[in-house]
């Protein structure tokens, strides 16, 4: 959790500085773990989006009648590649 907002300004500044340093250390360690043990790139893989020509909103059936749902899953037809695979299969 982020540091608490208590104490003097100097104490808060020191806590924030230590917290940011700890977060940087955690981030660098997690990058090393991802790259060495899992063989994955530490940077996130960019999401592969389909071309805009393949996207369509089919509003012939029940547009406006569903209330809160808006766009149903049957109205957008896009085959998404398996980019969001968690990579935790063993």
Swiss-Prot record:
Residue(s) carrying Phosphoserine: 66, 73
Annotated region (Disordered), positions in chain: 1-24, 64-90
Compositional bias per record (Basic residues), positions renumbered to this chain: 10-24
UniProt short sequence motif Nuclear localization signal and RNA-binding (RRE), positions renumbered to this chain: 8-24
InterPro entries linked to this entry: REV_protein (IPR000625)
GO biological process, one term: mRNA transport
Subcellular location as annotated: Host nucleus, Host nucleolus; Host cytoplasm
Residue interval(s) of motif Nuclear export signal and binding to XPO1: 47-58
Molecular function GO terms recorded: DNA-binding transcription factor activity; RNA binding
Keywords: AIDS, Host cytoplasm, Host nucleus, Host-virus interaction, Methylation, mRNA transport, Phosphoprotein, RNA-binding, Transport
UniProt PTM: Phosphorylated by protein kinase CK2. Presence of, and maybe binding to the N-terminus of the regulatory beta subunit of CK2 is necessary for CK2-mediated Rev's phosphorylation.
Subunit text: Homomultimer; when bound to the RRE. Multimeric assembly is essential for activity and may involve XPO1. Binds to human KPNB1, XPO1, TNPO1, RANBP5 and IPO7.
Additional notes on this entry: The Z-84 isolate was taken from a 54 year-old Zairean male.
Protein name (record): Protein Rev
UniProt source species: Human immunodeficiency virus type 1 group M subtype D (isolate Z84)
């Amino acid at each position: 959790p982020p540091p608490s907002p208590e104490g003097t300004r100097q104490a808060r500044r020191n806590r924030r500085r230590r917290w940011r340093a700890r977060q940087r250390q955690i981030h660098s360690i997690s990058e090393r773990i991802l790259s060495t043990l899992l063989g994955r790139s530490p940077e996130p893989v960019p999401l592969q989006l389909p071309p805009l020509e393949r996207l369509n909103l089919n509003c012939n059936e029940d547009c406006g009648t569903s209330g809160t749902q808006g766009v149903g899953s049957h109205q957008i037809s896009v085959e998404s590649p398996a980019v969001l695979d968690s990579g935790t299969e063993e």
